Amino acid sequence: MTTRIPEASLIRIVQSYYDAVDSMDADRLSSLYLPAPSTTLQFNADPPIVTVEAIKAFSAQLFQTVASIKHSMIEIWTNPLKGDVVPVDLPPPRSSSTVTVVSTALPTFSIRNASGVTSVALPATSIFTIDKQTKKFVSVHNMFDIAKLFAAVQSST
């Protein structure tokens, strides 16, 4: 039997994700994910990054690329989403052992360049699927214009 995660706990879990990203500590961030072979991190329609180890490696590389990340204007919808909102046929499968919540935020990425630091703010929506028992992330799907971040990084080199 699975238990319901109280709203305050869901907010704390999602906020801990943003705090971990902002800390730019790949170990801290990866520790929030469920250590399962199907755990994913995905951006937009790109193929998902699968396994905690791969998520940690990707995060470490991202954190070396940018000077800082700061999330603001965070909104979290804690009512579990139904199958008609989040497609249930997308991996990983949603089940009674998970809860899915949505959040919007404004992450600001700072990139060092020859003239100092450039900041790029990218409005984002994230879908978090959380394991009810462990309160760890099974899946995080971030949607924002990541091409703008890559363009800013490219122009800084």
Across the structure, where does each feature detected by a protein language model lie?
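Short, low-complexity N-terminal intrinsically disordered segments enriched in polar/charged residues
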Residues: M1-P35, L41
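A solvent-exposed, acidic/Ser-Thr-rich amphipathic alpha-helical stretch
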Residues: A26-T104
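Short beta-strand segments enriched in hydrophobic/aromatic residues
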Residues: Y33, A105-F109, F144
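Short, cysteine-centered beta-strand-loop-beta hairpins and adjacent loop/turn segments enriched
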Residues: Q64-S68, P107-A121, L149-F150
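Short beta-strand edge/turn micro-motifs at domain boundaries
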Residues: S96-T98, A121-T157
